[in-house]
Amino acid sequence: MTVTDIILIHGALNRGACYDAVVPLLEARGYRVHAPDLTGHTPGDGGHLSVVDMEHYTRPVADILARAEGQSILLGHSLGGASISWLAQHHPDKVAGLIYLTAVLTAPGITPETFVLPGEPNRGTPHALDLIQPVDEGRGLQADFSRLERLREVFMGDYPGEGMPPAEQFIQTQSTVPFGTPNPMEGRALEIPRLYIEALDDVVIPIAVQRQMQKEFPGPVAVVSLPASHAPYYSMPERLAEAIADFADAPAEYRQTATKAGPDRPAGADGGRADRADLP
């Protein structure tokens, strides 16, 4: 099947509108591009308390996959990495490639919270945890909006405008269902080509954590490195769109050149691929 669609999946506390600058750039490359809200992220859909499980949480994307004429590329940002792993397992024939944008890429059977909570070396997101608090008996997470300047610095250091991005790009409370759900990937899903887009200056998911996840994943991962913090769709939409479209044009080629990564692997050239077999 031919790749016809690219689906951009947001992370925690975000909505699909965060990709507004990227969507038209990918459309100009000839793709149908979607940036849906996951369940609980659209005003009036029941919010975080309505989320039952990952099937329910990712249903808006599954519906797009079902309607697509060909195969789709799935991109997940941050916590959205857990969503694309789930979708790849349950819809492998509809997915041509997976892109993890400074995202959760846990090994099968491992939950995202394993890399969020402090623990072993190259784990933990202390800057993010300092700004997030559990609510509703642990069923939701809220950002501390009384510290807007710090929120912007940590989560949106790439935003080029004054103040905060538009409010419609965010939600108040995030469901914790994705954090506690193990990656279900096995079999066919593990054969789908994967690209990890590193954000070298990210303090939400530090580069050491990004590379530890790549190292522990049971299979090769192609890599592109960007000199960005946690939200490169704000600071460098053109370069991000180029990396996405290049992968979408030939995901099988990336699978052939992908290799294992690790916390000590050198980054690629500024914005370039670092996925060749001769890398240490």
Swiss-Prot record:
Pfam families referenced in this protein's UniProt entry, alphabetically: Abhydrolase_6 (PF12697)
Enzyme class, spelled out: hydrolase
Statement: the UniProt record of this protein carries the keyword Hydrolase: yes
GO biological process: jasmonic acid metabolic process; salicylic acid metabolic process
Keywords in alphabetical order: Hydrolase, Serine esterase
InterPro entries: AB_hydrolase_1, AB_hydrolase_fold, MES/HNL
GO molecular function annotations of the record: methyl indole-3-acetate esterase activity; methyl jasmonate esterase activity; methyl salicylate esterase activity; trans-permethrin hydrolase activity
Signal peptide coordinates: none
Active site, renumbered: 202 (charge relay system), 230 (charge relay system)
Enzyme Commission code: 3.1.1.88
Region (Disordered): 254-280
Assembly with partners or alone: Monomer.
Known function: Catalyzes the hydrolysis of pyrethroids pesticides. Catalyzes the hydrolysis of cypermethrin to equimolar amounts of cyano-3-phenoxybenzyl alcohol and 2,2-dimethyl-3-(2,2-dichlorovinyl)-cyclopropanecarboxylic acid. Hydrolyzes cis-permethrin at approximately equal rate to trans-permethrin.
Name of the protein in its database record: Pyrethroid hydrolase
Species, as recorded: Sphingobium wenxiniae (strain DSM 21828 / CGMCC 1.7748 / JZ-1)
Gene name linked to the record: pytH
